[in-house]
Regions:
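Short, acidic loop-to-helix structural element flanking the phosphoryl-transfer center
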Residues: 225-249
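The alpha/beta-hydrolase serine catalytic core
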Residues: 90-199
Length: 268
């Protein structure tokens, strides 16, 4: 039975197209794509099945982008690696696997592998060989080739702070300034989508539409309890405000204690 109380974002990406690019051994039928459709009922979410060979996958994606002219592309893991190279469109790379060859071998994904989701072509198994790994290594050498100031504005990176598989935050940050850590692992679960991905999508949608939200400033001292721990109401209040306002936190910035600023940023 459908959950009538599930929060959605009917005012987000209205009439726009989003391409979702799945990860390794996944498919367009992934639950992640359906979550995005549920959250943004006024948007069209396109989620293709990718060929296992990276050159074929990249060709499919480029043709799809040319045909559909999406307003936003979201890619996770392997899909995040492909997404980075789809220049000219606003993009979000979630836990992008920019070192796919090493990721496959280090994560014991060689040999016979089973797709995690149903593919339209009916294929459910594949043999991952050394030759295929080399194809991925060759593909990742093309990442970051066309980064310029405009692309840096278009691209966001989201990185789980407990991701045991992909560790590319520093590599991404060498090329793109909009890199964000979130509380989560490698797999993009619904909690991470709701709390971390949706606010970035909202920011991109606002920018595309030229919307200026009113600003709310919150003193950091109001966020903590008597023991310096975040108040239990903090997260919920922040998300409620974020639906309608640009929210900023105000913290002291002592010039003689530069480390204090980093500590406060980490706490928030």
């Amino acid at each position: 039975m459908e959950n009538q109380y599930k929060k959605t974002f009917p005012d987000l990406m209205v009439g726009k197209k989003i391409i979702y690019v799945h990860g390794f051994m996944s498919a367009g039928s992934t639950h992640t794509a359906q979550i995005l459709r549920d959250y943004m009922p006024q948007a069209t979410v396109i989620a293709p099945d990718l060929p296992i060979h990276p050159e074929e996958a990249m060709a499919l994606l480029r043709n799809l982008v040319d045909a559909e002219q999406p307003d936003l592309i979201i890619g996770t893991s392997m899909g995040g690696m492909y997404t980075e190279m789809l220049y000219g469109t606003d993009r979000i790379c979630v836990n992008p696997a920019f070192q796919m060859g090493a990721t496959i071998t280090e994560s014991n994904m060689m040999g016979k592998q089973v797709f995690q989701n149903v593919r339209q072509d009916g294929i459910q198994e594949v043999i991952v060989t050394k030759a295929l790994v080399k194809e991925y290594k060759d593909m990742t050498e093309n990442c970051f080739k066309q980064v310029d100031a405009k692309e840096q504005e278009r691209v966001f990176g989201l990185f789980g702070d407990a991701d045991p598989i992909v560790h590319t935050f520093d590599l991404f940050s060498e090329h793109y300034p909009q890199a964000i850590h979130f509380h989560g692992e490698h797999r993009l679960i619904e909690k991470a989508i709701f709390h971390y991905l949706m606010p970035v999508i909202r920011w991109i949608d606002d920018r595309q539409e030229g919307r200026e939200r009113r600003t709310v400033l919150i003193d950091k001292d109001t966020l903590a309890d008597a023991y310096g721990k975040p108040k239990s109401s903090l997260h919920k209040a922040y998300e409620l405000l974020l639906d309608n306002y640009n929210v900023y936190f105000v913290c002291p910035a002592p010039t003689n204690q530069p480390s204090a600023i980093s500590e406060q940023q980490a706490w928030i």
